[in-house]
From Swiss-Prot:
The keyword Repeat does not apply. Its EC number is 3.1.11.6. It is an enzyme of class 3 (hydrolase). This is Exodeoxyribonuclease 7 small subunit. It holds the Pfam family Exonuc_VII_S. Keywords: Cytoplasm, Exonuclease, Hydrolase, Nuclease. It comes from Moorella thermoacetica (strain ATCC 39073 / JCM 9320). Bidirectionally degrades single-stranded DNA into large acid-insoluble oligonucleotides, which are then degraded further into small acid-soluble oligonucleotides. It catalyses: Exonucleolytic cleavage in either 5'- to 3'- or 3'- to 5'-direction to yield nucleoside 5'-phosphates. The keyword Nuclease applies.
């Protein structure tokens, strides 16, 4: 598994912030800028993947007919996972 795929969300986000700072700075060559941009895209995809994994695991516990029932949480602005 590539190193970036093992990163936690927080670590990937931190690396992404560093990439953005580097791109906003001065003195990068075109080639370096492209490399940072590509790394940033990979990190964004990884962060989205991690968020999607967590979103799929979030559940709301409801009490229906005396039984505890779970269903997936529907987040505003995101995909609806509710039943």
């Amino acid at each position: 598994m590539p190193e970036e795929e093992q990163l936690t969300f927080e670590a990937a986000l931190q690396k992404l912030e560093e990439v953005v700072q580097a791109l906003e700075g001065e003195g990068l060559t075109l080639e370096d800028s492209l490399a940072y941009y590509q790394e940033g895209i990979r990190l964004v995809r990884l962060c989205r993947q991690r968020l999607k994994e967590v979103e799929g695991k979030l559940q709301v516990i409801l009490l229906q007919d005396g039984e505890v029932v779970t269903r997936e949480l529907s987040l505003p602005g995101g995909e609806n996972h509710g039943t």
